[in-house]
Amino acid sequence: MKLVAPFETSMDRTDVRRILLVQADVDGVIGWAECVAGEAPFYSPETADTAWLMLRDFLWPLIKEKDFSSADQVWDLLARVRGHNMAKGSLEAAVWDAEAKQKGVPLARHIGGVREEIACGVSIGIKESLDELAAAVQKELAAGYQRIKIKIKPGKDLEPVRRLRQDFPRIKLMVDANSAYTLQDWPLLKQLEGFYLMMIEQPLGWDDLYSHVALQKKLDTPICLDECIHTEEQARAAIELGACKIINIKLGRVGGHTVARRIHDLCQRHGIPVWCGGMLESGIGRAHNIALSTLSNFTLAGDVAASKRYWEEDIILPQVTVSPQGTIHVPTAPGIGFEPRLDRIDKLTVRKERLA
């Protein structure tokens, strides 16, 4: 699926998304989910191709002949495979959707959600010029989004933030480095504190908790961890070591709803706020993010935005929309609450496989 506009981070630039969709037939009820792995292993070691192989050859065989009484047992069946959370999460989430449909309840309620609407922020990629960035921010504020996140990298950090604080002094603003810096860059990151940021997301290495501990001691601005957190155990270590003050929970990165809820609960017990990050999902993945964001400790606006921000035409009906107040109404229909557009999915599909 071609994006409405290219999206650039410190790691790469995305113009087109190759999306892996997963259907789970649970006693005749179809659940849908999306594997968020990208085409290249820049954000995560996983790719769409590795996820396909893992689902077909390793993960599906682990559950195909197993009896389980609830969706929250699927994760434990898949845990024998190390890593590959995005592949695991897509299979597990599809089962959650099917189970919610079987019970006739919205997925949000089924996983323990408490909100009827969620607050929305927006993530803006690296732009060629400061004027282009400021115009993009103005457009998103006019659309109602409650929080602005911009991607940064060395050479495109202080000046973009300075410009936005000059033009928009009162907005909720944060930055995301996607591991673009090292601990030796801490004096530069310290300079960002003068711009009253909500947080600095994943400034250092994607697997480096130790350096984040040292950096957080030098900063008053909260560090938010993203790529460092793949498991409940890593989240616990980050919290107890003091590596961060906020955690971004991405459904695919942690392996699905079961682990996402465990991390959510852990953070809540320790007073660590969380929010839901995005991975340029289609509407199917976005629907799961909406449900996840209804849990009580998702107190910060996440990267769950309207379909039209990313796609000329989404693959669900209705498309995800954001209110003028910057919120998304949580659907009340059973399961994810949106209908996959089978005609459009068939038109876009280049490969499929049925596992029985």
What are these regions (language model features)?
Residues M1-Y43, W311-E313:
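Structured beta-strand/loop patches that form or line metal/cofactor-binding pockets in enzymes
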Residues M11-R13, W75, A79, K101, ...:
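N-terminal amphipathic alpha-helix/helix-capping segment at the start of soluble metabolic enzymes
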Residues V22, G28, L59, L91, ...:
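Conserved, mostly hydrophobic/aromatic
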Residues D25, I30-Q102:
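Metal- or metallocofactor-binding catalytic centers and their adjacent structured scaffolds
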Residues A33, C120-I124, Q146-I150, L173-A177, ...:
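Hydrophobic faces of well-ordered beta-strands that scaffold small-molecule active sites
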Residues R109-L219:
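Metal-dependent enolase-superfamily TIM-barrel catalytic cores that perform enediolate-based chemistry
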Residues Y196, D207-C224, I229-T327:
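Shared catalytic-loop signature of beta/alpha-barrel
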Residues R309, I315-A356:
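C-terminal extensions of enzymes
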